[in-house]
Amino acid sequence: MSGTPIRGTPGGTPLSPTRISRLQEKEELRQLNDRLAVYIDRVRALELENDRLLVKISEKEEVTTREVSGIKNLYESELADARRVLDETAKERARLQIEIGKLRAELEEFNKSYKKKDADLSVAQGRIKDLEVLFHRSEAELNTVLNEKRSLEAEVADLRAQLAKAEDGHAVAKKQLEKETLMRVDLENRCQSLQEDLDFRKNVFEEEIRETRKRHEHRLVEVDTSRQQEYENKMAQALEDLRNQHDEQVKLYKMELEQTYQAKLENAILASDQNDKAAGAAREELKEARMRIESLSHQLSGLQKQASATEDRIRELKETMAGERDKFRKMLDAKEREMTEMRDQMQLQLTEYQELLDVKLALDMEISAYRKLLEGEEERLKLSPSPSSRVTVSRATSSSSSSSTSLVRSSRGKRRRIEAEELSGSGTSGIGTGSISGSSSSSSFQMSQQASATGSISIEEIDLEGKYVQLKNNSEKDQSLGNWRLKRQIGDGEEIAYKFTPKYVLRAGQTVTIWGADAGVSHSPPSVLVWKNQGSWGTGGNIRTYLVNSDGEEVAVRTVTKSVVVRENEEEEDEADFGEEDLFNQQGDPRTTSRGCLVM
């Protein structure tokens, strides 16, 4: 220990050795008192630190126990829900299997009906083939009949030509008959004229004969009477022969002309009758052939319609079976995907639970290590802890809206940040505060959030750094957000607004996060949207974010208010400043949750 030089009295009188010894002892005692005071202060500070650490450890144990019990209850409820969902899925799967069995039975019935219809179709196709053969045969017969018809028509045409020729011949013969009749009349007239001429000449000849006889009577008195009679007889005979020959020629010519005309007329009539009979028979055969063709055509069209209807029914049954098969395959795939998602979700929850257990175990080990260090120091110093700090925790809850508070506390040479848990409350905030008596002043600022909603859509979360805003559909129905606007105003600054697309729909129970363009998040609708025209939502002291529907009505709002608090402490600046609260941080990426504990 170094000594302090002893000076003389002001008057210059030297001090006695006893006085010097007393002064040295006094100085040494003062130094020892100072060291003792420093030691006592240090011990007091250590005791306060031990008390603070013990309180923190107890609170950490309480928080850890509460968190573990809460997480345990949460996961037990989630596991119960998962088991319930699995049971419902199993029931649904059993129901679907029963339905699949029914559908398989129906499918078998459809297959049997299809086979029956197929057999009927085969029979119908065989019948169609037979009818086609019959149709081809009928077509062949029809072709034959048509050929016969054409030949008969040709014959009829020939007969008509012959009839025309016969009619022409008949007309010619008629004309010839008329001519011959005229000739006969003319000949008869000529014959009559000749007869009259003959009679006249006969009379003339007789008169001449009489005159000649009279003349010869005078001349031939001597002529024999027999010779005169002979000459008269010869002359009469010659005249009679000439008359008979002329009559025979006229009768023969008349008879021949009448026979020729009658024969030609009878031949023409017979040919016309035969042609009429042949044409009538051809018409009857053609009519019968047409009737048979029409009957076969009707039968064929009926069978074709029946076959087409059967094919349409078979096609409809096949399409129905394919549709039902695809439908049940899709349902099974959807159920399998749901079960896979549930398994993945359960595995993720189990992983998070395991991570939380690992964090709890690490915290327990760290707390145990600090407890052992403190107990060892207390035993070494033989000190007993004297708690001199007071910790108060206050919470308020309600049921209509939610709010959160962030408390940041500053002191000389130290800065601590305590973030409070977001609680449900109507215009209230859940905050945690801690106080230690001291003499130095401290300042803090408080961030409080208040949220409310009049419909099913609420502003679930906002980033204090202006990266994103998250909305949630709290109902069990899909909500259309077409042409809705999400607006934000910071203080008295300019209002910014994000407009949803006309066809955007927020699914039931789902959330959507609208990120700024500078956040570096990729656009992945419908759950992640990027505001490409705006880099950030902005930050500031007083932030008001609200959702407006297509009618201009405000349906949800969330406000963030920042306030500064200054406190005076009664301890010296070397004494510790203390504040503690359960921490659930709202800042950062909403897709990840960070939980931790810091031991100051």
UniProtKB/Swiss-Prot annotation:
**Which PROSITE patterns does this chain map to?**
IF_ROD_1, IF_ROD_2, LTD
Q: Where is the IF rod domain?
A: 25-381
Span list, region Disordered: 377-449, 568-600
Q: Where is this region: Coil 1B?
A: 75-212
Query: Where along the sequence does the record place the motif called Nuclear localization signal?
Result: 414-419
Q: Which residues carry this modification: Cysteine methyl ester?
A: C597
Extract the InterPro entries matched here: IF_conserved (IPR018039), IF_rod_dom (IPR039008), Lamin_tail_dom (IPR001322), Lamin_tail_dom_sf (IPR036415)
Spell out the residue numbers of the propeptide: 598-600
Residue stretches spanning the membrane: none
Q: Which GO terms describe its cellular component?
A: intermediate filament; nuclear envelope; nuclear lamina; nuclear matrix; nucleoplasm
SMART domains linked to this entry: Filament (SM01391)
Extract the ranges annotated as region (Coil 1A). 28-64
Q: Where is the composition biased (Polar residues)?
A: 584-600
- Domain LTD intervals: 445-562
Which segments carry the region annotation Head? 2-27
Region Coil 2: list its residue ranges.
237-379
The protein's job, in short, is: Lamins are intermediate filament proteins that assemble into a filamentous meshwork, and which constitute the major components of the nuclear lamina, a fibrous layer on the nucleoplasmic side of the inner nuclear membrane. Lamins provide a framework for the nuclear envelope, bridging the nuclear envelope and chromatin. Plays an important role in nuclear assembly, chromatin organization, nuclear membrane and telomere dynamics.
Q: What is this protein called?
A: Lamin-B2
Species whose genome carries this gene: Gallus gallus
